């Protein structure tokens, strides 16, 4: 994507004269020229020049003032997940930056593009432990892709573009930009830079050929689709490819919306612990990680890979395609490992296949082996049916199942659902199917408090769609203050808080590891319905599926902020 500065234009080769302005104003101009349309943040005196620059561009950039920096940073991370473009967050030094660090961690683990701008103490105050001083290169060295401190005002446009591009290149993620207060108020006529985002990395022909061979020869092939390098057209492309070739297709942890769950190829999604999908995946003879990173929730510990990986040998038929070469082979060796755009790799694979035809397609039976094609079809059907049965059993027997039956009947596939972390997340992960991207925004980092800021980002980006956020009682209290931000921006969001008066996930682990010794996990909660009303929401408090359904009937299509507290027992 190419963004041309609207004014004060220039590039590295042919800079044009610009009006003299403060460094903070130049930064805002560069953001506008680079296509940024929204920023999240909490104001601070350390970057007042940037804030003043925003005053001149309120028609270009939507300013979302949040109530805590952690909420702002998580919303920015969610924006990156929703759009593929960097979410922008602005905070002040010291406490502002430390509060925002949780969102940087979320963006890193989710591979979500994000740029965090931090006001900094003046340059001549540094290295004295001055008021609110932090060394951000040290603080964010492990959390961010890159930490850039702009110490020369003339480099503001250049380094701003560099940060935006770094956030989306390779393995997408967070970039931190540090802005010394005195630098921001210096005058500069530095020209703006044209931003040309990095082109996708094309696959090499040998890797495509080898991947095709492995998939063609496999009896039980499985593709695991992740969101890194994801484009909306990738989901239908890989689903169609798997469908005609007898390949099972799974979604990485909390990435169900990448695949139409109704497809006969869909095999389920990976989650905490072992489900029917993990058990089935142990039998796969070829596994293709496509834009996904193996981790404890997406296949890192599968039994059939441990022996080979421990001996330094590739496990059975591992293919790994990921935009960043540093991720390839990090978890276990791969027969085919290549740094490439997942979309471009799939396009090349389909082209190599010749489009596929007949039973099993070109990748479905090698040289027309009907027995192999039949075996692949049976494998694909088994995984699809096993997962469908798993979802149905959850709907009938799990704590959240009866409630989600009511929810699913009233909210269609266009609904965007967000959640944070906790046992309540099983309500939307194990009791609902997805078919539209984006329709489920959740963090792979296991960060409580993510769902509310993610809903804020989703409602701003998709004002024409229904947005529902689920939170546990513990999870909600981490960032519930952002309901005030939703109300201030007149957003239509339904908030559902599942209240069991526990940090339920930890209590569950505690009972398993140290049975009969509960401590440190019970919660004395406020009146959530009253709290929601204080934020201006219409509220309801329910405890049965029937009461829940009645509240949904009232709130489902109503505008504005709505809040349902669901009182439950158990976890």
Where do the PLM segments sit?
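Glycine-rich, acidic loop regions that bind phosphate or pyrophosphate groups
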Residues: 8, 118-159, 255-376
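Conformationally flexible catalytic loops at phosphate/diphosphate-handling active centers
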Residues: 11, 162, 166-217, 355
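Glycine-rich, anion-gripping cofactor-binding loops and their flanking helix/strand elements
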Residues: 81, 227-319, 433-464, 477-481, ...
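A short, small-residue-rich loop immediately preceding and capping a beta-strand
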Residues: 37-40, 61-64, 82-121, 224-227, ...
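Thiamine diphosphate
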Residues: 117, 126-132, 265, 269-272, ...
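Active-site diphosphate/adenylate-binding microenvironment
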Residues: 24-34, 42-45, 50-55, 378-462
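Phosphate/pyrophosphate-binding active-site segments
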Residues: 2-18, 154, 213, 314-421, ...
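Glycine/aspartate-rich loop-and-adjacent alpha/beta segment that forms the canonical ThDP
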Residues: 2-5, 183-204, 297-298, 303, ...
